[in-house]
C-alpha cells in the first residue's frame, strides 16, 4: 500500500504525466533505490500513468528510506523530469506484528514529462519561362498566398528560378497555399494567368521531428510570351 495504510508490506506508487502527447503504456521506466543508492526495482508506467513497484515485506521494525527516479533514455522530442521522489517507510512492532506506514516528501508524487517535436521547414519553388525573349533576373514577380492573404512576394532569378522563403511549421496540420504571378505591365509581354494550389501536410515522424510534405508542388511553371510591338 502506497498511501499510508497499515500493513507489514508496502507497494510504493507514483504517477506519470505527459504533456504534449498521449501517454502510452510502458513509455517510461522508473527506478526504486534504497538509502545506499542500490537499484531495488525498475518498473514502467501503465496506460493511465500509474507507476507501481512490487510490494516490499518487512520483517523488522525500523525506518527505511527510498528514492524513486525516472530513467532518462533520451527519446527524441521528450523533456524528462529530473526530480527525484523520496519516501520514508516506518515499520513498528506492535504486539509482535509489523505495521508499516509510508510518507512521501512531495505529496503530489508525480513525474511530468513534455513532448514537442522539432519544427519543420519547407521551401516552395517554381520556374519562369519567357518565350520570345531572354529572361532577366527580377523581371517578374510572384506571390505565395494562404486564404487570399499574400505571405511572400519574390521575383525570378536570371535562370527563371522562383524561390519563396522557407515556411515554418510547428504542429501537425494540413495547409493549402496558392502560387501565382503578379500581373505586370512590361510592353509586349503576355502574362501567365494561372494559379497553382499546393497542399502541405505536416506529420510527426515519431522521432521528435515534424516533416512537411507538399503535394502538387513539382514542376510549377509560369510561361509568359513576348511579342515585339509593331
Stretches found by the model and what they are:
Residues 1-230:
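Solvent-exposed loop/turn and edge beta-strand elements of beta-rich ligand-binding domains
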